[in-house]
Amino acid sequence: MEVLNNYQRQKIDESNDEDFYSSPKFVYHLDANFRTYLSSVYKNEIKDNSTVVDLMSSWDSYLPLEKKYKQVIGHGLNKDELEKNKILDSFWNQNFNLNQKIPLDSSSIDYCLMVAAFQYLQYPEDLTRDIARILSDKGKIIISFSNRAFWHKAPNIWTSSTEEERLTYVRKVLISNGFEEPRIIRKFNDISFNFLPFLKNDPFYCLIATKE
């Protein structure tokens, strides 16, 4: 089911995303606390010997190395970044804002991961429906994000929303396009340390939803 209107899909920079991501960015876009907590979520949620796809990935997937995976497949826009991601068994390049059809077999994936990625989707409904298609019975999607973004590349739905509104938006896309009610995780820094703004941790938001 469609959730966004045409205005909400628009973004400041409508140029091809492939041009923006043509140069590799070997930096962390999320702080160490966020990355560590995300890895702990993956450790608890992902069963051993599962097939995992990391959509809109980069040079690090934050997957715990001590777990056993049947296969880890990566996707993104920059070949150099994905080649450096050593946990990936394979990967492919594709612009999801131009083509939302995932080149994977139906029911072939146990877990789909999206880290700091959903905020760039202009057609999240179509992609979410196809994610549901590739997931196995009771397969899960794990979407995580913070309050950071390349704002000129994020559609209006994201840039004009509060952090709570973004959670509501992602939830609506999920439950309208093949997923059960998601479990939502929020993690913030201790307010007692907020007197030094530059020491604030990135807020952690995560939605975990099971395929209907």
Where are these regions (language model features)?
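Class I SAM-dependent methyltransferase SAM/SAH-binding core
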Residues: 44-102
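A short SAM/SAH-binding and catalytic strip from SAM-dependent methyltransferases
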Residues: 110-125
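Short alpha-helix
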Residues: 37, 161-186
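A short glycine-rich, Lys/Arg-flanked "PGG" loop and its adjoining helix->strand segment in the class I
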Residues: 125-140
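Core SAM-dependent methyltransferase catalytic element
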Residues: 178, 192-212
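Conserved class I S-adenosyl-L-methionine
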Residues: 141-171
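A short acidic, Gly/Pro-enriched loop at the edge of an enzyme's catalytic core
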Residues: 99-112
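Class I SAM-dependent methyltransferase Rossmann-like catalytic core
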Residues: 1-47
